[in-house]
A protein has these predicted regions:
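Active-site-proximal specificity loops/subdomain of glycosyltransferases
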Residues: 45-85
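C-terminal catalytic/acceptor-binding lobe
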Residues: 173-316
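Short beta-strand-to-loop acidic/aromatic patch adjacent to the donor-nucleotide binding site
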Residues: 84-97
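Short beta-strand/loop segment that forms part of the nucleotide-sugar
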Residues: 34-44
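Conserved catalytic core of nucleotide-sugar-dependent glycosyltransferases
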Residues: 95-180
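N-proximal low-complexity "stem/linker" segments adjacent to membrane-targeting elements
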Residues: 1-22
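Catalytic phosphate/metal-binding cores of nucleic-acid and nucleotide-processing enzymes, i.e., regions
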Residues: 18-24, 42-44, 67, 71-72, ...
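Short, acidic, metal-binding catalytic loop of nucleotide-sugar glycosyltransferases
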Residues: 23-35
Length: 338
């Protein structure tokens, strides 16, 4: 049996966040008596909760100028002090249940080097869960499945991996987008297969607001820290569609859709680059015609989009027709000797 060290970076324990974070931590404790739990950071209430629930505490962690924790500092310290070989980084609002434990046991018994990750299920939880109720897990799972809000493959909230896998981590900050997709990319880049456990594990995300950020949801997803995270991963980005295996019905199966999904992403990227390249090339013509790039999603923006598409598409068709006509006659343009 592979025992687990779970580590997380809680927000301040206050209000609704206090309730859902305690729910999450107590659910991890119910996975197995020997599970080790580490909370990282000195945010309000963290030390007191660690003492109350009997979990380990890493108080000091590197932060940026806004006080947001660096992912690298969290990962390096957690891997250094973890008692067990298998670690799990999970967001501190995620309730894990027995299906998660079974998934970890299955994969860790078959693979020495791996990353298990999965999509979350969004659920409204506004009160403390009753862990003394023997049916708490069945009730919560039923609520999640009935709500039926499983996130897309871009949203990953737990990562299970052997100690030492992440020996190099860029200067991402936690709580902003981008770093989770980099973790997937890095695992594949060092030869560790990814197991998508989304079909086998109901990982319950307890919904919350974004009042912890001064600019709310917009600041979390599009603020300066988010933009820095995006720049850090550049093209080093994967989703669960790139998983090597999927876990389903207690069995690991090769992800047959992996190459198709990757090809689709490359195609979309190519279309975007082609579109914006043609916009640059045709800018003088479009300006002469009084057309501008659209930044609005309203009626005017949509009209400009179709006008631009007509001009760009027409020019692209003319270019393709010229290339086809030249090469179909066996001619080579002047100055292009072969």
């Amino acid at each position: 049996m592979s025992i687990l060290t779970i580590f997380a970076t809680p927000k301040p324990f206050e209000g609704h966040i206090d309730v859902i974070q305690r729910n999450a931590i107590r659910s991890w404790q119910h996975l197995h008596p020997d599970v080790e739990i580490i909370l990282v950071g000195d945010d309000q209430g963290t030390a007191e909760v660690c003492q109350e629930l009997g979990v380990k505490h890493i108080q000091h962690v590197s932060r940026n100028k806004y006080g947001t924790k660096y992912l690298a500092s969290v990962y390096y310290q957690a891997q250094e002090i973890a008692r067990h070989r298998i670690l799990c980084h999970v967001n501190c609002d995620i309730v894990l249940m027995s299906d998660f434990w079974r998934a970890v046991q299955l994969v860790s018994n078959l693979k020495d080097r791996f990353l298990v990750a999965g999509r979350r299920w969004d659920v409204e939880v506004d009160r403390a869960l009753d862990f003394e109720d023997p049916n708490w897990e069945a009730g919560l799972r039923r609520l999640a499945l009935d709500t039926n809000r499983q996130r897309s493959p871009q949203w990953i909230d737990y990562f299970v991996f052997p100690k030492g896998l992440y020996s190099r981590v860029p200067a991402f900050v936690i709580g902003r987008p981008g770093w989770d997709n980099w973790l997937l990319w890095y695992a594949l880049s060092v030869g560790a297969p990814i197991v998508d456990a989304s079909g086998a594990v109901v990982a319950v995300h307890q919904n919350h607001d974004y009042s912890y950020h001064p600019d709310g949801k917009e600041g979390v997803w599009h603020g300066e820290e988010a933009q820095t995270n995006y720049k850090l991963h550049e093209n080093q980005y994967e989703t669960l569609e790139s998983a090597s295996y999927v876990l389903h019905d207690g069995r690991l199966r090769r992800n047959r859709k992996r190459l198709l999904a990757k090809g689709a992403r490359h195609l979309v990227a190519f279309i975007y680059s082609l579109w914006f390249g043609l916009l640059d090339v045709t800018r003088p013509i479009r300006r002469a015609l009084g057309l501008r790039s659209t930044r609005s999603l309203g009626p005017r923006g949509k009209r400009r989009f179709w006008q631009n598409l007509l001009v760009v598409g027409g020019l692209a068709a003319l270019i393709l027709w010229w290339v086809w006509s030249v090469f179909s006659r066996g001619e080579v343009p002047a100055g292009r000797g072969y």
